[in-house]
Structures are given as structure tokens and as C-alpha cells.
A protein has these predicted regions:
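Central beta-strand plus flanking loop segment that forms part of the substrate or channel wall
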Residues: 163-198, 228-232, 247
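FAD-binding beta-loop-beta segment adjacent to the flavin cofactor pocket
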Residues: 267-284, 342-343, 359-361
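Glycine-rich phosphate/pyrophosphate-binding beta-alpha loops
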Residues: 207, 271-273, 289-301, 339, ...
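Glycine-rich FAD cofactor-binding loop and adjacent beta-loop-alpha segment at the N-terminus
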Residues: 6-9, 13-74
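Glycine-rich, N-terminal phosphate-binding loop of Rossmann-like dinucleotide-binding domains
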Residues: 13, 160-161, 292
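Conserved N-terminal helical subregion
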Residues: 3-4, 58-61, 70-169, 176-184, ...
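Conserved FAD/dinucleotide-binding core of flavoprotein oxidoreductases
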Residues: 204-267
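C-terminal helical "tail/cap" subdomain of flavin- and related membrane-associated enzymes
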Residues: 312-408
Length: 408
């Protein structure tokens, strides 16, 4: 193959793009990683922690990534319950009762380092330039760069939200809406052992999540994801001592004495859904396809689900000798993932709006739903299965099998 001809071109420099590079290496397809000029180092100091489903963790293991993570033994979802206040509704997911792992909490930096160590990519696999145009031919697309370089690719995979230029050259359109909320994330040190318990508190202005982390140098640690009205964020973060005092008042009952372990970061929350995930030879996955509210902690699991479907299509293309955009698996992806993705994003948005509403109808609905779910193990299992990779049919990598294992 010509040195500028590739099976896939992978756009982005985050975790999703790196896993996609790993998929390409694992299944023997040629690829180039187009990182872009401005994005190359943006993820170096990311302090977030991610909740991986058991299926996602198993998928990474098949690809050679064994992550050191904290298993979630219980996921405790509460309306109220902070500042020694009354608990108005609750759902408890217990891994022992469900007989399956709920989630695994791992720091972004740990995942990133594990991926980079496994990949060990040299410069021949990547480009740190931004494309200026993409044209379509019958059997491939051409990607043009400012430095006159031209790349040919059978499939262009976008893993991060497309900037204005990329939207224009790929004819991508998004539907946007603003949550009018901002998320705060940081790592907390606390006096009590987290016991592997995760908490999700639904508060008046948005959810607050505590995710258990593994101990570091005998220190008890948890990750905080706190969503507040954007208009309140500057006050919440104005003073570290006041921020710590507020967290102790809210969560001290569960974690003991709390200290902020790393400086918090904040980011505004917006919902974005692409109108089509497959446009000619351009496919959008992960953050390129959707931005969702963080209350369920499912954004990266959804990205890995995209990748698992795409891996099936790549293997099918090789086995059957078909152009990848003609493969049944990719056509199924286009149809099925759009429906799944939209339903998931809108469902999470609906839950957020219901818990922020002060109407008596919304209060009655959410508390009755929490009571129903908490008393029905079958509903808990259904929710846990959907979060873990799909309650019904799953792609091969999410059932602990190599991609393409279902293809005859």
C-alpha cells in the first residue's frame, strides 16, 4: 500500500481516538491518527475519573489494556440525603445482590498512560496538522492539509466534537441545547474509607456524584462530579476553604472530614447530537456524535460501544473482502446506534429535568419511580445491563469476544 493510503484515518487525540488506534493495530488495518495542531497536548493534565462498565473493561482487556481500578460495590442513588437532610427517594444497586460488577472507577490519567504505553506509536502513525478539505471518490476519500500533504482513506473516524472547519468540510450538523448547568470535578481526600461505594445525590440545582477511587499512599480518595447552575459556579469556586467547608457540610456524613486533593476544574454542560453519524466515508463516534449530561457517567462507555460496533464492521470488511462502507455491520451501526444514542442522551436529559423540577407532579413521579426500581431486582438488572453495553444485542467486544466473532 502507498505510504499515504490507509484503511482508516482517525481524528482526535483523546482516549477514544487512542482506543480506535489500538483496535486498528489489533485487527491489522492500516491507519493514520490525525491529531490536529491545537489538540496534541490538551489532555495531559485531565483530572477526571471515569466509570467503566464491566463490558467496557473487558473490551479493553481483549485489546491488551489491564487497568488498575476501583470496583463499585454499591451504587447508592438518593434524592436529598446531604447535610444530614431527609432522604426523599433512594435506589441502591448492590453488586453482590445483582451478581455482577456495577462499574469500575479509574482516573483518566491512568487510562491514558496505559493506552500510550501499549500503543508506542511513532510519528509515521500520526499527523499534527489540521485538514483543510476532504473530497470523496468512489473507493476512498482524500484529506488535504495546509502543508500540501494528501492522505487517502477508506473511512474517516472522528472521535471528538467537530470544530467549525471540520463541520463544514464533512457537511456535519448538530442539534444543540444548553443545560444552563456547569460541572465541577476534582479529587477529594477524606478520613473515612469509601468502602467501594458510589453515591449520586439529586439536589435542587443538579446532581452531585461521589465515585470511589483506590487508595493512594494510604489516603482515602474519591472523585467528585458536582453539577450546579452556571450562575452559581463562580461563588461555589471563589474560595478553596469555603468550597471545602461546603463539601464537608454536604457529604461529611458519608466520607468523614473532606479535603480537596487537587484543584477543581469546571466546564459548562451542553447537549449536542449529530444529525447523522455516517456521512459518505466520514463516521462520527463518541464525543463527535454526542455530548450528554454527566449524571449517569456513561459518555465514555457509549463511545466504547460505538468502537465495538465499528470493530465488527472492520473485521467483517476484511473477512468478506468488502468496502467497509458497504458492510452490513456498518449499515446496522448507522441505523441502530443513532436510535440507541438519541434515546440515551434524551433519556438522561429527561431524568435531569425531572429531578430539577419543583412541581408536585415531577416530585411524585420521580419518588414513585425510585421506589418501584428499588423494590424490583429485575428493573435494577435491566438498568445495569443497559449501562454495561446494551440490555439486548451487543457487539462482539462487549460480550468478551473478539470483534467479528458473530460473522460466519
Amino acid at each position: 500500500m502507498n505510504k499515504n493510503n490507509f484503511d482508516v484515518a482517525i481524528f482526535g487525540n483523546g482516549l477514544t481516538s487512542k482506543v480506535m488506534c489500538l483496535v486498528a493495530l489489533h485487527y491489522g488495518v492500516s491507519f493514520i491518527n490525525i491529531k490536529g495542531k491545537e489538540k496534541e497536548e490538551k489532555n495531559a493534565d485531565d483530572i477526571r475519573s471515569l466509570a467503566l462498565s464491566s463490558a467496557s473493561k473487558g473490551m479493553l482487556k481483549i485489546l491488551g489494556i489491564n487497568l488498575l481500578s476501583q470496583p463499585v460495590k454499591k451504587m447508592i442513588v438518593l434524592e436529598g440525603g446531604v447535610s444530614r437532610g431527609k432522604i426523599k427517594g433512594k435506589v441502591i444497586f448492590d453488586a453482590e445482590e445483582l451478581q455482577e460488577q456495577i462499574a469500575h472507577i479509574c482516573e483518566y490519567s491512568v487510562i491514558n498512560k496505559s493506552l500510550e504505553k501499549k500503543l508506542k506509536l511513532d510519528s509515521k502513525y500520526s499527523i499534527t496538522e489540521d485538514p483543510i478539505s476532504i473530497t470523496e471518490d468512489r473507493d476512498y476519500s482524500k484529506i488535504f492539509f495546509k502543508n500540501k500533504k494528501i492522505i487517502k482513506s477508506k473511512l474517516n473516524i472522528f472521535t471528538e466534537k467537530l470544530d467549525t472547519n471540520q463541520q463544514n468540510i464533512t457537511n456535519t450538523e448538530y442539534n444543540f441545547s444548553d443545560y444552563d448547568q456547569t460541572a465541577i470535578t476534582t479529587t477529594l481526600e477524606h478520613s473515612r474509607d469509601n468502602k467501594g461505594y458510589a453515591y449520586q445525590f439529586f439536589l435542587k440545582n443538579g446532581p452531585l456524584a461521589l465515585l470511589p477511587l483506590k487508595k493512594s499512599r494510604s489516603k482515602n480518595l474519591s472523585s467528585l462530579v458536582w453539577t450546579e447552575k452556571t450562575s452559581n459556579i463562580s461563588e461555589v469556586l471563589s474560595n478553596k476553604n469555603v468550597f471545602e467547608k461546603t463539601l464537608n457540610e454536604l457529604c461529611g456524613t458519608y466520607l468523614g472530614k473532606i479535603k480537596v486533593y487537587v484543584d477543581p476544574i469546571s466546564f459548562p454542560l451542553k447537549k449536542a447530537i449529530c444529525k447523522s453519524q455516517l456521512i459518505n466515508r466520514n463516521i462520527l463516534i463518541g464525543d463527535a456524535a454526542r455530548s450528554m449530561h454527566p449524571l449517569a457517567g456513561q459518555a465514555w462507555n457509549q463511545a466504547l460501544r460505538d468502537l465495538a460496533y465499528l470493530a465488527d464492521a472492520i473485521v467483517e470488511s476484511k473477512k468478506l473482502g468488502l468496502d467497509i462502507i458497504s458492510c452490513p455491520s456498518l449499515l446496522t451501526f448507522k441505523r441502530k446506534r443513532k436510535i440507541e444514542s438519541n434515546a440515551f442522551v434524551e433519556g438522561i436529559s429527561f431524568i435531569n429535568s425531572v429531578f430539577m423540577s419543583e412541581s408536585s407532579l415531577a416530585k411524585g413521579f420521580r419518588r414513585n419511580m425510585m421506589k418501584l426500581i428499588n423494590n424490583k431486582d429485575i428493573l435494577k438488572k435491566l438498568i445495569a445491563n443497559e449501562a454495561s453495553g446494551g440490555a439486548l444485542e451487543r457487539p462482539s467486544l462487549l460480550i468478551n469476544e473478539e470483534a467479528g466473532s458473530k460473522i460466519i
